[in-house]
């Protein structure tokens, strides 16, 4: 009986930690990573997924988008450079997220963040050494580095879609607010170009 109670308490504690991490993720996705996700989806060629599509999608459509996002393709290599550099600019966010995942004992998230931070450091070392060169141009023939790039950027797309699915199920009005904020930012960026 005691073991059953302990297991129930552990499950409840884990659920509380998941909820706390979801709040942290909400803040991060809505504020500090907004530009990154807008850029990443903007550079995406296949699957053809836009923030507008996500906003108007049903749960089953979001799940279909997520499946299609297992294999991503980008418009061009040059379109990847600003997305990669935005990852570098947001390193502090990934570091914070890794620390919170450690605090909450979410090992898979910690592993993902370590991989991402290592990638960011690869880019930073390159840019410190060759500030005038495009990172993507220099590594386009390096198979290992290109795999890292597609993994990091693709994982970003998939993470956003996973989060959209989670919110669609648990807090659809919050998903709508986040996507409204994203579209507002996108529109401001478009207006500033003209």
Predicted features, each with a name:
Residues 1-13:
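Membrane-embedded hydrophobic alpha-helical segments
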Residues 16-194:
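Long, hydrophobic alpha-helical segments that serve as membrane-spanning/inserting helices
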């Amino acid at each position: 009986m005691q073991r059953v109670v302990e297991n129930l308490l552990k499950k409840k504690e884990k659920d509380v930690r998941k909820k706390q991490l979801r709040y942290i993720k909400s803040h991060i996705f809505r504020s500090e990573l907004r530009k990154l996700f807008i850029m990443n989806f903007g550079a995406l060629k296949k699957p053809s997924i836009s923030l507008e599509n996500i906003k108007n999608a049903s749960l089953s459509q979001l799940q279909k988008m997520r499946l299609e996002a297992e294999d991503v393709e980008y418009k061009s290599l040059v379109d990847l450079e600003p997305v990669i550099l935005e990852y570098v600019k947001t390193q502090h966010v990934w570091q914070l997220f890794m620390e919170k995942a450690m605090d909450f004992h979410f090992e898979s998230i910690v592993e993902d963040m370590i991989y991402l931070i290592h990638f960011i450091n690869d880019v930073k070392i390159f840019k410190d050494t060759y500030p005038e060169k495009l990172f993507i141009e220099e590594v386009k023939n390096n198979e290992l580095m290109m795999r890292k790039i597609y993994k990091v950027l693709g994982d970003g797309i998939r993470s956003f879609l996973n989060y959209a699915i989670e919110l669609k199920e648990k807090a659809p009005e919050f998903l709508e607010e986040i996507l409204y904020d994203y579209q507002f930012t996108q529109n401001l960026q478009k207006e500033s170009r003209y």
